[in-house]
Amino acid sequence: MSTVPCGVLRSRIRYDPWTVRSIAALVALALLQAPLALPPTRDQLFALFGSYLDSLRVQAGIPGLAAAVIDGDGIVWEQAFGQQDVARSLATRTDTPFHLDGLTQVVTASLVLRCVEDGRLTLDTPIGSFNPGSADAQATVGQILTHTSGTASDPVFSYRPDRFDALASVVSTCTGSSFRLAVARTLERLAMTDSMPGPDAANDSSLAGDAGRFRNIIDRMAIPYSVDAQGRAAPSRYPAATLTPSAGLVSTVLDFAKFDLALRKGNLLSADTVAAAWRPPVSSNGRPLPHGMGWFVQTYEGEPVVWQFGSGAGASSSLVMTLPARGITLVMLANSDGLAKPATLASGDITASPFARLFFQVLIK
C-alpha cells in the first residue's frame, strides 16, 4: 500500500505533546486577554474553539475530522476539518460517515437498558442464561455494561470492549430479532438516515429494503488512514468488518446528535435509567470506578462528565463527551486513530485527551 503525502496535515510534523500543550497555553492566553475588551460572544468562542481544534487535528495526525456541539434543543455548532479523502482532495463534511468504533457501545447499552426497563431481564442476569458457551457466562449483564468483574460488594474495573460482544445474545433474546436488526430499528426510529448497522449491512437480506441507502453511505464514507510520525497518511482499512455490540456502527456527527438528544430527552430511556447508567459502581474502599453502564463517568473540577471513545487502530477514532449539568455534548469523528488513544483513555480519565482539555478550556471555563 502506497504512502500518500498528507497535504491536509500541512507539514510532516511529529505528534508532539509539548506542541499540544503549547496550543492549550495559547488558548488560555487568548481567554485571559478577553476581559480587556468585551466578553466573547458564543459565536466568537466557537470560532476560537474551531481554530484551535483544527491546529490540534494537524498535530495529532488526523487527515479529516467532523465535530458538533449539541445542547438541549439541538446542534448549536458544527464544523468539518481537513479531508475525508486525501488522494482525491475531498473535504470532510459534517454529514461525512465515519466508523464509530467503541461509540457503538453506547447504542448497545441503550438497547440492553431498554430491555431492563421493560422487565424482560435484570442487570443481575448471568450472560450464560442467554449464551451458555460464552467466555463470560458467569458474568452478569450489569458487569458487562460496566466493564467490571468480581463481586457486587467489591467490583474490579478493566476496560475490555470485546466483552460487550456477549450482549448480542442478550439483545437478540430480548427483542426477538438479530442484534443488527435491533440496532437498525433504533436508527430508523431516530431518523438517522446517514447511519448504518455495520459496514456490511447492505448484504443482509433482512435489511434488503435499505441496501441502496447503505451503499450510498459506504460511497460517502471517510477513507481510513494510518499516519506516520512524519505526518504522511497511508490509506488503510477499518478494523471492524461487521457490526458487533462493541464496534462497527457507521454514522455522522449530525446523526449521532439525534441519538444524543433522544437519550437526554428521555425518548430512548427514562430519566431514572439514564441517571443509573451514568452512575459508576463503587469499589469496596468507597471509591467510584471509572465506568457506568456503557459510558465512562468522572468529574472535572467538581462537575460530572460522561463520555466514551472509539479507536480503530491505524484507521479511525471517535470521542463523545456530555456534561449533564450543563446539558451540552461534544461529538467528534476522525479518519485516523489520532483522536483517541486507548493507552491514554482506557483507564478512565478524559483529561488525558488534549481534545477534551481544549473543549473544557474554551467552551466550559
Where are these regions (language model features)?
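Glycine-rich, flexible loop segments associated with nucleotide phosphate handling
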Residues: 92-97, 214-220, 347-358
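Hydrophobic (often cysteine-bearing) scaffold residues that line and stabilize catalytic clefts
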Residues: 45, 49, 100-104, 108, ...
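Short, surface-exposed loop or secondary-structure junction motifs
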Residues: 81, 85, 126, 134-314
